[in-house]
């Protein structure tokens, strides 16, 4: 358990660097940024936004099962553990949001520029939200629609919890099997999703940090359960020879 906690904690620390630096710098979100970079980050956000998040989870579940190659019964246990970790994170996020009820950055901006009180905003219809910013030409249409779709509270970030959980599951489950490229890609993807939430005006840096560490707790428990119920996460002895052969082929 301790080794798992150390491994996943290192992953959580790496994911925490970006939001922590933003928080310490005192940077504040303001609308008006646009361009292909922001649009790319929007598509990163969309990989988590429903319904695409379901497809992302299905693809990642299949990839994890292929990478670990457990037999049928352990594979089913692993599938259940991974899905439970992701779903538990989303339920935890929703429960905390209803308690804290922190407004999103763009909501406070609407309050200042359009005179919509923050406490009244969450009672408005989504179409009303889109009409409020219809005349703001410096805000892209796709961002207006995203704001209208995402009218929940900010703290903590559900998108971050989803992406960070999958990235940390990669650290916990796949790193011991030397699937380092997959882990690196998952970490980069999670960091891009997290960055998109700040730059799109959806979250504060602290929302990302808290979500990351909630994910760490859930994933650490999930990885420990997977090790107990599904078998060792390290490379099986019969695969060592295959790995050695692949490394020799690369050198030659």
Report the location of each language-model feature:
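Aromatic-anchored segments of alpha-helical transmembrane domains
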Residues: 16-23, 86-92, 188-201
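Cytoplasmic membrane-interface segments at the C-terminal ends of transmembrane helices
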Residues: 66-69, 229
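Alpha-helical transmembrane segments in multi-pass membrane proteins
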Residues: 81-85, 89, 93, 211, ...
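Low-complexity, proline/glycine-enriched hydrophobic segments characteristic of transmembrane helices
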Residues: 98-150
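N-terminal transmembrane-helix/juxtamembrane module of multi-pass inner/ER membrane proteins
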Residues: 1-63, 70, 77, 93-114, ...
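Alpha-helical transmembrane segments of integral membrane proteins
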Residues: 6-11, 73-85, 181-185, 206-210
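Residue-level signal for the membrane-embedded core of alpha-helical transmembrane segments
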Residues: 51-55, 87, 161, 165
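Membrane-embedded catalytic cores of phosphoryl/pyrophosphoryl-handling enzymes
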Residues: 2, 127-252
């Amino acid at each position: 358990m301790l080794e798992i906690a150390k491994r996943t904690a290192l992953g959580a620390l790496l994911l925490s660097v970006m939001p922590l630096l933003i928080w310490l710098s005192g940077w504040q979100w303001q609308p008006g940024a646009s361009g292909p970079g922001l649009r790319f980050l929007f598509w990163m956000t969309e990989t988590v936004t429903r319904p695409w998040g379901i497809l992302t989870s299905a693809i990642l579940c299949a990839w994890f099962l292929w990478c670990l190659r457990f037999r049928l019964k352990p594979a089913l246990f692993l599938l259940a553990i991974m899905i439970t970790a992701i779903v538990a994170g989303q339920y935890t996020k929703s429960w905390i949001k209803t308690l804290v009820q922190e407004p999103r950055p763009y909501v406070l901006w609407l309050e200042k520029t359009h005179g919509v009180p923050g406490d009244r905003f969450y009672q408005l219809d989504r179409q009303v939200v889109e009409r409020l910013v219809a005349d703001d030409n410096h805000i892209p249409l796709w961002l207006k629609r995203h704001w209208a779709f995402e009218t929940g509270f900010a703290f903590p970030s559900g998108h971050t919890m989803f992406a960070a959980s999958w990235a940390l599951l990669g650290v916990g489950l796949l790193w011991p099997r030397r699937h380092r490229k997959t882990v690196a890609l998952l970490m980069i993807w999670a960091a891009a999703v997290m960055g998109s939430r700040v730059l799109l005006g959806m979250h504060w840096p602290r929302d990302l940090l808290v979500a990351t560490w909630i994910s760490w707790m859930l994933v650490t428990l999930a990885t420990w359960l997977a090790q107990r119920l599904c078998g060792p996460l390290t490379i099986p002895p019969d695969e060592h020879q295959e790995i050695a052969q692949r490394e020799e082929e690369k050198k030659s």
